Amino acid sequence: MAKKIVGQIKLQINAGKATPAPPVGPALGQHGVNIMGFCKEFNAKTADQAGLIIPVVISVYQDRSYSFITKTPPAAVLIKKAIGIQSGSGEPNKKKVAKISKDKIREIAELKMPDLNAASLEAAMSMISGTARSMGVVVED
């Protein structure tokens, strides 16, 4: 028989840097999960993606065991990494901070495809372009 899920926790943690400190500790502690065990597993699984923020969905079962699924980094994080900026524009409609090529948008869309609710690569590219525009990044053809 399948284990009964008693809770789902969604967090965004820096790859390879999960620690029992907030936000990880309190979120897992209230469900009775082994915090150090999770941190070690997560850090081992994401060590190769250092510097990126990794969304993770943790399923907690009735016997206090858990499983987790890592997702691809948020589009905004990938865009910032691709063009080498620290943050997006505070006023994206007035002040543009950088430019990004369609090729880089395509690369990001291909990477994000498993997590996006898009039927085609073109639809995924459109979503990533929208994220870039909302950050004050100009999308070039």
Curated annotation (Swiss-Prot):
InterPro entries assigned: Ribosomal_uL11, Ribosomal_uL11_bac-typ, Ribosomal_uL11_C, Ribosomal_uL11_C_sf, Ribosomal_uL11_N, Ribosomal_uL11_N_sf
GO biological process entries: translation
GO molecular function: large ribosomal subunit rRNA binding; structural constituent of ribosome
Superkingdom of origin organism: Bacteria
UniProt PTM: One or more lysine residues are methylated.
Keyword check for rRNA-binding: yes
A GO-annotated cellular component: cytosolic large ribosomal subunit
Cystine pairings recorded for this chain: none
Pfam families: Ribosomal_L11, Ribosomal_L11_N
Homology family: Belongs to the universal ribosomal protein uL11 family.
Subunit-level organization: Part of the ribosomal stalk of the 50S ribosomal subunit. Interacts with L10 and the large rRNA to form the base of the stalk. L10 forms an elongated spine to which L12 dimers bind in a sequential fashion forming a multimeric L10(L12)X complex.
UniProt name for this protein: Large ribosomal subunit protein uL11
Taxonomic lineage from the root: Bacteria, Bacillati, Bacillota, Clostridia, Peptostreptococcales
